[in-house]
Amino acid sequence: MCDDEEVTALVCDNGSGLVKAGFAGDDAPRAVFPSIVGRPRHQGVMVGMGQKDSYVGDEAQSKRGILTLKYPIEHGIITNWDDMEKIWHHTFYNELRVAPEEHPTLLTEAPLNPKANREKMTQIMFETFNVPAMYVAIQAVLSLYASGRTTGIVLDAGDGVTHNVPVYEGYALPHAIMRLDLAGRDLTDYLMKILTERGYSFVTTAEREIVRDIKEKLCYVALDFENEMATAASSSSLEKSYELPDGQVITIGNERFRCPETLFQPSFIGMESAGIHETAYNSIMKCDIDIRKDLYANNVLSGGTTMYPGIADRMQKEITALAPSTMKIKIIAPPERKYSVWIGGSILASLSTFQQMWITKQEYDEAGPSIVHRKCF
């Protein structure tokens, strides 16, 4: 960007589950921590223990036994602005150790987010943190940049929301975006439920984090769900054991693939929606007939909920079944896709051509928060 160390842009990808933050031009985020704010469940007994009234991120996670944990971002939308400010404050001052008033800041948001949401983000950045400039980018578009493409369809599945976003020459096609409020957190909840049927009880916010870990370590997507169920019923070859923090060992079998199967069959959790393979197909079908071929050949997976082993093969199989038989279909699953939104942001914010795109403090002062709709596409 420049030889000046001072003006590196900051990139902050605020996910429903994890905040990924760092400096533009880096190849990975410096700070990755849970988007959690925890408050003590009980009044502190011991005087002088210096108990804080709130904890953020990893500290909240490690003290989860005595805290009530809340996620300020639900389904990709910020629902609790006070907590969100705490998270940003923690990001700038404790994790990155920078003064936000010295750095342009790139934030990300989910496609089809309410307009008021990005206005409020803009307002807080300029008024609370006094950033010199900022920009709000759409997550899926950044993931596509990170994969080195400007055209393709992104399946972005995070902790709070899943989308299929067709992008052509760098622009998202809003009329064809499919949004599904079914993502990692719902899968964790579903796994909690089906483990209960096995006789293991997980209820508190702290225990939910244990189940999330089980999900991340042991779950996978079956290529053929019925076959896999039959295999699981007739042999114990698919069973795996997991040691809980208290030393108890639990065994998990068909739950390993029943949990992420929900992505393809949302009826498992009582949702009437189509699965991610169908929404991808529907999204492509809403696009102009001339660009469909390019979209089919560039299905890019992004986000933590696409990290399940077997998901790319299953998507390939399902979309091939829906698409015209002569169509070439390619699923791209970059190994770093957990962070591809952040990486795309890092690339974008360090491009020389992007520097005129920032919303400056001056522009904000003249036009107010609504400037974000004019400048950020």
From Swiss-Prot:
Gene Ontology terms, MF aspect: ATP binding; hydrolase activity
Pfam families named in the record: Actin
Residues carrying Tele-methylhistidine: H75
PTM annotation (N-acetylcysteine): residues: C2
Positions of modified residues (N6-methyllysine): K86
Domain of life the protein comes from: Eukaryota
Subcellular location: Cytoplasm, Cytoskeleton
Sites of Methionine (R)-sulfoxide modification: M46, M49
Group of enzyme by EC: hydrolase
CDD domains: ASKHA_NBD_actin (cd10224)
EC number: 3.6.4.-
GO cellular component, one term: cytoplasm
SUPFAM superfamilies assigned: Actin-like ATPase domain
Reaction catalysed by this enzyme: ATP + H2O = ADP + phosphate + H(+)
InterPro entries, alphabetized: Actin (IPR004000), Actin/actin-like_CS (IPR020902), Actin_CS (IPR004001), ATPase_NBD (IPR043129)
Disulphide-bonded residues: none
Modification type N-acetylaspartate: residues: D3
Record keywords, A-Z: Acetylation, ATP-binding, Cytoplasm, Cytoskeleton, Hydrolase, Methylation, Muscle protein, Nucleotide-binding, Oxidation
Modified how: Oxidation of Met-46 and Met-49 by MICALs (MICAL1, MICAL2 or MICAL3) to form methionine sulfoxide promotes actin filament depolymerization. MICAL1 and MICAL2 produce the (R)-S-oxide form. The (R)-S-oxide form is reverted by MSRB1 and MSRB2, which promotes actin repolymerization. Monomethylation at Lys-86 (K84me1) regulates actin-myosin interaction and actomyosin-dependent processes. Demethylation by ALKBH4 is required for maintaining actomyosin dynamics supporting normal cleavage furrow ingression during cytokinesis and cell migration.
PANTHER family: ACTIN
UniProt family annotation: Belongs to the actin family.
Subunit (UniProt): Polymerization of globular actin (G-actin) leads to a structural filament (F-actin) in the form of a two-stranded helix. Each actin can bind to 4 others.
General function of this protein: Actins are highly conserved proteins that are involved in various types of cell motility and are ubiquitously expressed in all eukaryotic cells.
More info: In vertebrates 3 main groups of actin isoforms, alpha, beta and gamma have been identified. The alpha actins are found in muscle tissues and are a major constituent of the contractile apparatus. The beta and gamma actins coexist in most cell types as components of the cytoskeleton and as mediators of internal cell motility.
Name of this protein: Actin, alpha skeletal muscle
Organism: Carassius auratus (Goldfish)
Gene field: acta1
